[in-house]
């Protein structure tokens, strides 16, 4: 896929007609596109690429195709999502890092479920340096699923777990009550490409975890049992 528009630029039909033609002349085997922040802008390329930052943790994961592209007969690609909507440092507390991961889950699941998206790219792979008026006061944008040194954050496991080449299993919570408001652990998730995840406590089988609601993904996250459930199970085996 060749990008033939300046990133997030406004329409310029004369210029972009020419760039589209040149790309096709140089490589007839690949489709063309161009990253937009605009809905229903002039589509001269083969694929409408759109930065969909509509998900805020509560809203749907992705906008419907009919609300974004002017041509339903051409493919729609989500070229960016999340990123600045929920900056996350690797040293943020557990609930923040979990919500960061779940936002990527929700958007990817929505893109899969719709059947209308050719693909969905999260913004972005790595944290990156920026100027003094952007980022977190330290000239760093914490938009990545990995940090600047390529160390994975929890959200990286969301993407790793969708593949089948290597076994992946990452628990979203450290289960430390001091990382959670009022010491309440709440719901935790397991990001894995396993067919089943079984929970043991002190070598005693507790339960097989159920899959989460995001079933459009190739490998939906698993939902852990509650801390209360674990305590009750511990009491039964004391």
Predicted regions and their residues:
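Conserved small/polar residues in nucleotide/adenosyl-binding loops
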Residues: 228-235
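A structural detector for beta-sheet-dominated domains
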Residues: 172, 200, 225-227
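A short acidic/small-residue loop/turn micro-motif
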Residues: 207, 213-214
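Aromatic sugar-binding surface patches on proteins
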Residues: 214-227
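Beta-strand-rich binding/interaction modules
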Residues: 187-208, 231
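Substrate-binding/catalytic cleft of secreted carbohydrate-active enzymes
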Residues: 1-151, 155, 162, 166-179, ...
């Amino acid at each position: 896929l060749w990008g033939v528009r300046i990133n997030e630029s406004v329409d310029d039909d004369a210029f972009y007609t020419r760039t589209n033609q040149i790309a096709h002349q140089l490589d007839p085997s690949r489709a063309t596109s161009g990253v937009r922040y605009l809905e229903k802008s002039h589509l001269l390329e083969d694929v409408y690429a759109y930065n969909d930052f509509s998900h805020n943790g509560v809203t749907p994961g992705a906008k419907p195709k009919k609300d974004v592209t002017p041509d339903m007969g051409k493919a729609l690609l989500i070229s960016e999502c999340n990123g600045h909507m929920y900056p996350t440092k690797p040293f943020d507390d557990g609930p923040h890092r979990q919500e960061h991961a779940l936002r990527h889950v929700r958007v990817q699941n929505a893109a899969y479920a719709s059947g209308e998206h050719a693909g969905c790219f999260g913004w972005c792979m790595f944290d990156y340096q920026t100027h003094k008026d952007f980022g977190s006061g330290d000239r760093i944008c914490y938009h990545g699923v990995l940090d600047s040194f390529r160390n994975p954050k929890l959200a990286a496991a969301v993407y790793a777990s969708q593949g089948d080449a290597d076994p992946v299993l990452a628990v979203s919570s450290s289960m430390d009550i001091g990382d959670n408001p009022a010491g309440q652990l709440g719901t935790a998730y397991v990001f894995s490409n396993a067919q089943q995840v079984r929970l043991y406590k002190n070598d005693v089988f507790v339960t097989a975890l159920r899959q989460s609601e995001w079933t459009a993904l190739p490998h939906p996250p698993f939902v852990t049992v509650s801390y209360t459930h674990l305590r009750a199970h511990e009491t039964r085996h004391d």
